[in-house]
């Protein structure tokens, strides 16, 4: 091999290496696909707090995401509008979705009273994640919670299916409301309006396993 061909070979390897590094640096962040977006307009007592926009991971957990989406729109004749956040624990989570009893003992899914855990591909790695509340294995209904800190002890027990896209400051306001017995807000924190936002799907910021 002469000097010219050796130089060309080296240059080719160098160029390919640079291209691979550039591709690694510029590729989109990994994350589950957000297939739909829903919103909650929140009031605390008579005071409007603002809007929370939630992105749902319909590719990773399609059944769970569809349940939440349909309950947010109320298209099945029942759903989240008018329900409350009945349990709020600072530096942990805010919980809602019990639109039948309002105390954490009720609620139902669009598939019947309960449905099975879909999968545990996603972990509770940060604040602002949307996950199913349950009473044990395969007891998902309509109740959900939004994390306000990482909660790794819930991994493998609760199905993560979305994230807060906008309005996390509203979540923080809910997290800090005065509470009474059972971590229930002293004044009602209500979802006064809910629905779906028609928008193009985007990537979430949660890493898939």
From Swiss-Prot:
GO terms for cellular component: cytoplasm; endoplasmic reticulum; endoplasmic reticulum lumen. Its main location: endoplasmic reticulum. It holds the Pfam family Pro_isomerase. Its EC number is 5.2.1.8. Residues 1-23 form the signal peptide. This is Peptidyl-prolyl cis-trans isomerase B. Residues 39-196 form the PPIase cyclophilin-type domain. The lineage of its organism: Eukaryota, Fungi, Dikarya, Ascomycota, Pezizomycotina.
């Amino acid at each position: 091999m002469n000097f010219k061909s050796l130089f060309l070979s080296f240059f080719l390897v160098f160029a390919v290496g640079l291209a691979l590094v550039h591709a690694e640096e510029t590729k989109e962040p990994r994350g589950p696909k957000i297939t739909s977006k829903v919103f909650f307009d929140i009031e605390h007592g008579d005071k409007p707090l603002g809007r929370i926009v939630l992105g749902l991971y319909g590719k990773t957990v399609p059944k769970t995401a569809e349940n939440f989406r349909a309950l947010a729109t109320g298209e099945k004749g029942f759903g989240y509008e008018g329900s409350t956040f009945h349990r709020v624990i600072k530096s942990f989570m805010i919980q809602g979705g019990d639109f039948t009893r309002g105390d954490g003992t009720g609620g139902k899914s669009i598939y019947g009273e309960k449905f099975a855990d879909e999968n545990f591909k996603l972990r509770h790695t940060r604040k602002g994640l949307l996950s199913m509340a349950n009473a044990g294995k395969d007891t998902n209904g309509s109740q959900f919670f939004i994390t306000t800190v990482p909660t790794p002890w819930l991994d493998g027990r609760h199905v993560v299916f979305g994230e807060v896209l906008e309005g996390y400051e509203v979540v923080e306001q809910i997290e800090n409301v005065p509470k009474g017995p059972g971590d229930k807000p002293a004044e009602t924190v209500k979802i006064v309006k809910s629905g779906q936002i028609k928008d193009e799907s985007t990537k979430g910021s949660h890493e898939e396993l």
